[in-house]
Amino acid sequence: EPVPETVPIASREQIEKNNSAYMACPSGSVITSDTNLFNRSYWTNNGILWNENLFVTVLDNSRNVIMKISSLAEGAQENNATVYDWKNYYECVRHVEEYGISAIVRLCRV
């Protein structure tokens, strides 16, 4: 089935003109909760200590924190770095997280 004429599709010409620095980037934050603590989503987690390692289950609560990395592509001329052309750059999007963990440990013997 062909794509209907009413659906807007960017032409190749438009894609080459656009600057990818202004694209929308969806977050990895796909889990929502009604529970908030200090205006941040909060989930109770389970963990286990095994063989001197701590394993903890975590969920993303970073709420759309995204880092964009841009680097000069292989084969691109160094002097081309002053004039923006999307073909001269590699664009990467990273969703980063930082965790602070507090643990209350109960010693038991199995």
UniProtKB/Swiss-Prot annotation:
Keywords assigned by UniProt, alphabetized: Capsid protein, Host-virus interaction, Late protein, Viral attachment to host cell, Virion, Virus entry into host cell
GO BP term, pick one: symbiont entry into host cell
Sections of the chain in a coiled coil: none
GO cellular component: viral capsid
Listed GO MF terms: structural molecule activity
Highest taxon in the source lineage: Viruses
Stored InterPro entries: Capsid_L1_Papillomavir, Capsid_L1_sf_Papillomavir, dsDNA_vir_gr_I_capsid
Record's signal peptide: none
SUPFAM superfamilies in the record: Group I dsDNA viruses (SSF88648)
Subcellular location field: Virion
Assembly: Self-assembles into homopentamers. The capsid has an icosahedral symmetry and consists of 72 capsomers, with each capsomer being a pentamer of L1. Interacts with the minor capsid protein L2; this interaction is necessary for viral genome encapsidation.
Role noted for this protein: Forms an icosahedral capsid with a T=7 symmetry and about 55 nm diameter. The capsid is composed of 72 pentamers linked to each other by disulfide bonds and associated with L2 proteins. The capsid encapsulates the genomic DNA, but does not bind DNA. Essential for the initial attachment to the host cell.
Family note: Belongs to the papillomaviridae L1 protein family.
Protein name: Major capsid protein L1
Organism: Avian papillomavirus fpv-l
